[in-house]
Amino acid sequence: MNKVILGIVITLIVSILLNFDMNVEANTKKCSQNPYVTTDIIQSQKLSSLNTETGSNSEMVGIAPSERENDKYQSMTQLEDETTEGVDWKKSIRNTGKEILIVAPHGGNIEQGTTELTKALADKGNYDYFSFEAIRPKNNSELHVTSRNYNDLMLNSMIQNRKATISIHGAKGNEKIVYIGGPRSDLRNEIEKELVSRGFNVMVPPDNLSGKDDENFINREKGNTGIQLELTYALRKSFFTNNDVRTKNRSYQYNWTHEMYEFLDALYNSIHNIYPNT
């Protein structure tokens, strides 16, 4: 009798274990077939591990617009009064009176990749440049000041007596797109032609990224051709190995990709074609 009962108990236990294994396998299969489960987990890990430099989820996942409506600081004057140079930000400047000026107004860890592209283009063409660079360990997006409120005294003085000013920005977007803004000009047309010929996706910018506002610093000096380039987050990521836009990876040129150099050459050739003697 005891043996019969024992046999029944063993049979029940085995049955329960088999059903448990089948349920686990089925649930695992469902998860593996559901892209949202995997994406959510990966996205969560990325935000927690990579987001220390921007201090906000927006830039890291490419949903931060270049022209923010609610900047913490309403001018560069206010920003500089309430923050500390060398701790929160720094400026990199070359001002030798060249006729072409390249600008990264939201460089460093605000719109990653714009400083590197700005300096590389300036070095290639021996142009002057201005780069404002956020260097905080976090909360760098707070240091964004929109272009129409960008009253940096040094930059305003540097814009004088130039043939062209090219301002390089980062925009939102999970597709690799460059928006070309600023008043229509020969240089703008040439940049568009060069980029398209190299396979880049060039699009007309939305109004908030158009660079046509009279108060935008690229338009303040009449006679100075102003160009505003807005590079999506996806495009800027592609400029660096493993799509890694953290400071350490961006800092070394051996981490720059072929796509970065193609974009750089397109800009340089455009400037040289329109202004061959600069």
Where are these regions (language model features)?
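Sec-dependent N-terminal signal peptides of Gram-positive bacterial secreted proteins and lipoproteins
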Residues: 4-22
